[in-house]
């Protein structure tokens, strides 16, 4: 049983993997992590899934409970690696808003933006379908309405439950074939290289990635603004304003990431599968650097 945020949920998945395969040191994980093929597509390793089941009770909104993957930091390389198996998904996920009143507000709101990032990049994906769009639009509607309510009244349990349902819908859309993009890819590197909490990585990166991608998916971005209650407005401006309304950081400077680290972040990002699913093609570190400079 795991009770807590997304990192704890993923830790539970990794513990189950260790129990199944007798992993007891860092080198033991190498055979089980996913790798990129020459086309930039993630290829999971083949292995027996864990026989020990997991019950997850999330207290944040990062939505890692609902998928078959787990992210784990490799402290040897400062890279965040992905592990995937259908049996890594928790057998039961319990959404109870009551315990979440004890979650620090910055964690609740920033992981809410993480869920909004899932829905936004999924809705803007070139792989989006009618099924995924249905989930993502409803996720954006719920999250954009409920997160400010919780900020105003931390004990508003109905609003907290709406946030949790929005979180679930924000990841359910991936079952319809949509993929994430550069906000997720760069965010993974910000976490691995600089230790930025992944809720904050979405706060900082998502608006700038939307602006970078506008030439490739302006029509899809209009759906984001519409779902958030701002039809006809620029999606990046809507998302940035929403993050500002919640009192969350919007620049790399605000999360203590300086230009001296940009090259390492960009290099790490080139090994992330989501970069190659970004709507605007990104093939070199300089493409990542362009977004980092905009977010500085």
Regions found by a protein language model. Give the residues of each.
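Periplasmic-binding protein-like
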Residues: 1-3
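Gly/Ser/Thr-rich loops at beta-strand to alpha-helix junctions
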Residues: 5-9, 61-63
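Short alpha-helical scaffolding segments that buttress acidic/His motifs in well-ordered protein cores
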Residues: 116-120, 163-171, 206, 239, ...
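Active-site segments that bind and position negatively charged phosphate/pyrophosphate groups
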Residues: 122-238
